[in-house]
UniProtKB/Swiss-Prot annotation:
It comes from the Eukaryota. The lineage of its organism: Eukaryota, Fungi, Dikarya, Ascomycota, Taphrinomycotina. It holds the Pfam family M-factor. Keywords: Lipoprotein, Methylation, Pheromone, Prenylation, Secreted, Stress response. This is M-factor. GO terms for molecular function: mating pheromone activity. It is found in: Secreted. It comes from Schizosaccharomyces pombe (strain 972 / ATCC 24843). GO terms for cellular component: cytosol; extracellular region; nucleus. Residues 1-32, 42-44 form a propeptide. The gene is mfm2. The modification Cysteine methyl ester is found at residue 41. GO terms for biological process: cell-cell signaling; positive regulation of pheromone response MAPK cascade; signal transduction involved in positive regulation of conjugation with cellular fusion. Induction: By nitrogen starvation. It is further induced by a pheromone signal. Its transcription is limited to M cells.
Length: 44
């Protein structure tokens, strides 16, 4: 979908989500997004 946004921003989020889901929870809470869909924050 958004390959550019995915390569630049979501890549670090996906990596953190795969390695440390709790880190993503904190990051997503700041952006008011659910940690279940870390890639949606970039698409939306």
């Amino acid at each position: 979908m958004d390959s550019i946004a995915t390569n630049t921003h979501s890549s670090s989020i996906v990596n953190a989500y795969n390695n440390n889901p709790t880190d993503v929870v904190k990051t997503q809470n700041i952006k008011n997004y659910t940690p279940k869909v870390p890639y949606m924050c970039v698409i939306a």
